[in-house]
């Protein structure tokens, strides 16, 4: 396919037009006074959103050169969302500001490579300063504040996320689902939960709820299938003598072994329940080892060299309570040593850090959550499907922002932290175009606060000047109340990770755009005209008319 090429200033200006178009759409959503964007969908009702990355992902421009600029800024937004889960609009505002200001200097004759170096050095110094002014998240109240700000000042969402984190801990799993009603609610599953239910309904102890509830049971964790009763019988007799319930977790239980368990359950000889092990392959083995550690038992595998007929009571795990339904099993309060669980958690954390697969990372985080505390489910309710989707997106944003805050701490919100970190650029001893690049970042970090003020109908430059004149580093402009106040006390906070990621990603892409000298795109194909075939058809019809006149 033929290509079209643009060079120098023509190329950079085309990229700038694309950057400005996507930035104009995205930055209108910034802050509590930001506006909604309505996105048309081919199927179903239009999507209404205030989420920057959602808006950015929908934008595709007609001009291929302008579209390149738009897509690169979209990359800033997406990357920030992937790393921190929030701050996508801030990242877009920063990227546009750095690129526009930098392009002005390149046009005036500055060396783009030196500008890029200065931009990156200034961004790194601001990031280090942000880390210094960062404050750790210590209380549930601070978690609620972060979540409220990220959810566009929805206190209900903020409080529910804080409650969920309080119950399952910072390593616990919190999932977001659509509710059937209009209320937003929180459900918490304590203990280890996995998606495998009983192998036979005859194991049920509560006919109303169709659940098998085992109080203070012994737990067998077996890697292979159990189908030979002869090997299993010695252990069954030992457990029956103890008089305690018995949970069997194995790859599968079938044939005479399963039939014997069912008969013993029906006769009341033994309160027993059998379930399949969760997962597949190596992940199944790892999850069974997790269950063994949680319950203080052994995972009976071929590697250990222990045969089923030789398993003793001391090899079994124990728990305070086990609830098994048709589709899932929940083990509450396993009798493990806390040191063993901590060691396992540390091991999984190392695996999360080392893995390069997003899928593996997600599964490892699920395992970590199940060991660490439990699973919380936030059911998002709303009056209409459109409102529910918009609200669910805000809950997801708030959840990611809260995790980021717990990880790296918080800084004053409302764009103030970036302005307070400006002073770090003054300490850099740069010369020439590198110093110019640093000054570009110095001015760009004011852009988020300026945009917040503009969206609220205020004069951005005046607000920035007033904030810079304040002596208390936590003081700034609260857009929600239209007041200058201590933002940390007022609960206007941003996660350090979000602010840091937004600046780093914006500086990276803007620097690359500035050093662009040539852009190449596919040449659009000319649409072939179908006039010729239409004319010949008409001619044929005319001939037929002539025949009719004869």
UniProtKB/Swiss-Prot annotation:
Job description of the protein: Together with its co-chaperonin GroES, plays an essential role in assisting protein folding. The GroEL-GroES system forms a nano-cage that allows encapsulation of the non-native substrate proteins and provides a physical environment optimized to promote and accelerate protein folding.
EC numbers, comma separated: 5.6.1.7
Protein name (database record): Chaperonin GroEL
Catalyzed chemical reaction(s): ATP + H2O + a folded polypeptide = ADP + phosphate + an unfolded polypeptide
GO CC, alphabetical: cytoplasm
Family the entry assigns: Belongs to the chaperonin (HSP60) family.
Lineage: superkingdom: Bacteria
HAMAP family: CH60
Residues given in the record as ATP binding sites: 29-32, 50, 86-90, 414, 478-480, 494
An example Gene Ontology molecular-function term: ATP-dependent protein folding chaperone
Subcellular location: Cytoplasm
Any one GO BP annotation for this protein: protein refolding
Keywords recorded for this protein, A-Z: ATP-binding, Chaperone, Cytoplasm, Isomerase, Nucleotide-binding
PANTHER family in alphabetical order: 60 KDA HEAT SHOCK PROTEIN, MITOCHONDRIAL
Oligomeric form and interacting partners: Forms a cylinder of 14 subunits composed of two heptameric rings stacked back-to-back. Interacts with the co-chaperonin GroES.
Keyword ATP-binding: yes
Gene assigned in the entry: groEL
InterPro entries attached to this UniProt entry: Chaperonin_Cpn60_CS, Cpn60/GroEL, Cpn60/GroEL/TCP-1, GroEL-like_apical_dom_sf, GROEL-like_equatorial_sf, TCP-1-like_intermed_sf
Protein's UniProt keywords contain Isomerase: yes
CDD domains: GroEL
